[in-house]
Structure formats: C-alpha cells, structure tokens
Swiss-Prot record:
Enzyme Commission identifier(s): 3.6.4.13
Residue positions of motif Q motif: 32-60
Main subcellular localisation: cytoplasm
PTM-bearing positions, type Phosphothreonine: T158
UniProt-listed InterPro entries: DEAD/DEAH_box_helicase_dom (IPR011545), EIF4A_DEADc (IPR044728), Helicase_ATP-bd (IPR014001), Helicase_C-like (IPR001650), P-loop_NTPase (IPR027417), RNA-helicase_DEAD-box_CS (IPR000629), RNA_helicase_DEAD_Q_motif (IPR014014)
GO molecular function (one): RNA helicase activity
Residues where N6-acetyllysine is found: K118, K174, K193, K238
Protein name per UniProt: Eukaryotic initiation factor 4A-I
Length: 406
C-alpha cells in the first residue's frame, strides 16, 4: 500500500536510492513513547511486560508508518530492536476475530524465524494472536495439519517452506495484508531472490511490504524497485553503523596455523561469560571443535549441516548459559538474540565485509557492552583495513589487559 498507490507503476523504483546504497530518509516523524503510538491496550501491556520502557531509535521512526500501512524500508544495525518494530506493527493491524493468516514474515535462517516467532508471541501475549514458524527441517505433515486446522494470524518462516505451503495452497494468501522481509540483505542475496519473487507473485498486489536490513547493497535496492510502492525510507548512513559499545581489536597471528594456539591462550587469560567464535566454513567448524575438545576445552558448535533438532538443542543450551562458548559459521550471525554474549572472536574474518556487522552485533545488543577480537594473518591485513574503511571505524591492536574490558 502507499500514499499514491494508484498512480504508481511497479517499474518505477524508490527515489533517493543511489547504486551503492547511500540512501536518504524521507520520514522525519519521531514518536518517543509507546503510549503515543495509538496502540491497543493489550499490545501495550505485552510491550511493557516484555521489558521495553522506551522505543529505540528505529522503533520511534518506523512503527507509525508501518501501522499506517505504508511500504517501509528500514535500515538499522543488528541489536536496535528491528524485530519488535515490525512485530508491534503487525500485532496492531491484526484482526483477532478473523481466523486467517494476515501477516507473513520471511527470515533467512530457521533460528532467526524461531526467534521472531518468540518475540511476536511475547509481545502479543495479552492479545491472543497466534503465530506459527513455518520452517524447513520440520515435519511437513504436521505443518500442513497446523495450517489447515488453525490458520494462524501470523506466519514467520524461511522462503523454501513458505513457498511450498503457498504453492500447495495449504497457506492462503487471501487475507495477507502485510509482508515483511527481515535481514533483507541476506534474503535477497542470490540464493533467495528467486524464492522471494515466487512468493510475491502469490500475494495480493496491494499487500503492504516492509523491508528491514542492516546494510543496503545495490542488489537489495534493485529488488525493492520491483515490489515496493513509494516506500517510506528510514535509514542510518553507513558510517553510523559502527556498533556503539563494542570494542574492536585485532591480534596479528601472522600465519593461519598459529590461530589455534592463540585461541587457546585467550581461553586461559580471559574469564569469559559467553563467547561466539565465527569461522567461514562448516568443515572448519568441525575441525576446530575437535581440536579444542582434544585439548580439554569445553565448546559447542553449530552449522547448517546439522539437523534441526540438534541445532535447537545447541541454541537452547547456549541461550540458557549452560554452554558458554559456541563455534559457528555466519548462520548464527543473522539476528539471533543471545543476550549474554560479551565476546565475539572472528577466528576467520568474514569473506563478505557486510557480514562483519552481523557478527559483531552479537556482542552488545541495545547498548550492552561487548568486545570483538579479530584474528588476522598477513594475508588478512588488507581485508581488515577494508572493513575499517567500509564502516568508518577503528580496530586497534588487542591490549594486554583485554580481560578487564569484558
């Protein structure tokens, strides 16, 4: 939906968007209290019960246009309250008496979809809204039964399973009025682009589209042209994407084979509350986990080759704090809200510099302090400088007293 819906053709892309994703906001209205957003009483109760006191910057700007039904592009870094922004907007617009799916949220990973579902259910706790996670790796027959019997108000899912359910007509698009793409930079990367298009073809042409992302590479902008109408743009400039409260350091390990000893030394010198170690390949996650276990370090590991049940158990243990150190690939870097993480170690620098912000955003959500340590070989030095330039940030050599900072 848009302010001038009828006068707009889908081929005319959003204005104010340059190829490199240097984008201007076109919405300046700020509402700095949840009480002033005209939200329902039961939704407000859920918001305050969840622990929110004051809307974050993105919530102050984006909730209102979302509720008014505009198409919205919202750019904010990890940990700023993006999920609650669209969850609140959806819950305010749901007709509770209509037992039909009215909002569809897509996320790039199963874990993120489940995280979003939890937030929606918690915020909507006093409303009686239903929300179902429609994700791969789960029983299809049980899914079909759930969709047919209940027709949940809100579906949160991954593109493959959602399209399958739409295609087989177990999920009806008839009453879907809001379509949300979370972590759109990842969603619209080549792997998911076609599925997004396919899903969009199934939805009504007047469905409201809300797109959220930490970064706005040109391929995302290209796709927004195809399915967004005169969107409200609420954005932070790239150089503002440095994550406040996160101290960033590097260790010059010189050679790849010296990383393992360096990591073990860190274990002995740091009293870690909880830490995530990022690695670029699934195979290397398994390799490092084995090496750490062989040296009697307790670590858990998670990557995309594991089945869903195993991944769920590992995430549950890590969230509860019973496991303290998690080795993973970028799978976890997309929006998983692990509150206690105070330390992120990039054992490998990310191959895609735009993933850097997703990884280190794990370390200090909503202003919580965090430390990031990047292990850098001679070959990595240029990549590190590239990341510094891209985010307009400074990454210093790790001081000897790093334990005091965590």
């Amino acid at each position: 939906m848009s302010a001038s819906q009828d006068s707009r053709s889908r081929d005319n892309g959003p204005d104010g968007m340059e190829p490199e994703g240097v984008i201007e906001s076109n919405w300046n209205e700020i509402v700095d209290s949840f009480d002033d957003m005209n939200l329902s009483e039961s939704l407000l109760r859920g918001i305050y019960a969840y622990g929110f006191e004051k809307p974050s910057a993105i919530q102050q700007r984006a909730i209102l246009p979302c509720i008014k039904g505009y198409d919205v592009i919202a750019q904010a870094q990890s940990g700023t309250g993006k999920t609650a922004t669209f969850a609140i907007s959806i819950l305010q617009q749901i007709e509770l008496d209509l037992k039909a799916t009215q909002a569809l949220v897509l996320a790039p990973t199963r874990e993120l979809a489940q995280q979003i579902q939890k937030v929606v259910m918690a915020l909507g706790d006093y409303m009686g809204a239903s929300c179902h996670a429609c994700i791969g790796g789960t029983n299809v027959r049980a899914e079909v039964q759930k969709l047919q019997m209940e027709a949940p108000h809100i579906i949160v899912g991954t593109p493959g399973r959602v399209f399958d359910m739409l295609n087989r007509r177990y999920l009806s698009p008839k009453y879907i009025k809001m379509f949300v793409l979370d972590e759109a930079d990842e969603m619209l990367s080549r792997g998911f682009k076609d599925q997004i298009y396919d899903i969009f073809q199934k939805l009504n042409s007047n469905t409201q589209v809300v797109l959220l992302s930490a970064t706005m590479p040109s391929d995302v902008l290209e796709v927004t042209k195809k399915f967004m109408r005169d969107p409200i743009r609420i954005l932070v400039k790239k150089e503002e994407l440095t994550l406040e409260g996160i101290r960033q350091f590097y260790i010059n390990v010189e050679r790849e084979e010296w990383k393992l000893d360096t990591l073990c030394d860190l274990y002995e010198t740091l009293t870690i509350t909880q830490a995530v170690i990022f690695i670029n390949t699934r195979r290397k996650v398994d390799w490092l986990t084995e090496k750490m276990h062989a040296r009697d370090f307790t670590v858990s590991a998670m990557h995309g080759d594991m089945d869903q049940k195993e991944r769920d158990v590992i995430m549950r243990e890590f969230r509860s704090g019973s496991s303290r150190v998690l080795i993973t690939t970028d799978l976890l870097a997309r929006g998983i809200d692990v509150q206690q993480v105070s330390l992120v170690i990039n054992y490998d620098l990310p191959t895609n510099r735009e993933n850097y912000i997703h990884r280190i955003g794990r370390g200090g959500r909503f202003g919580r302090k965090g430390v990031t340590i990047n292990m850098v070989t001679e070959e990595d030095k240029r990549t590190l400088r590239d990341i510094e330039t891209f985010y307009n940030t400074s990454i210093e050599e790790m001081p000897l007293n790093v334990a005091d900072l965590i």
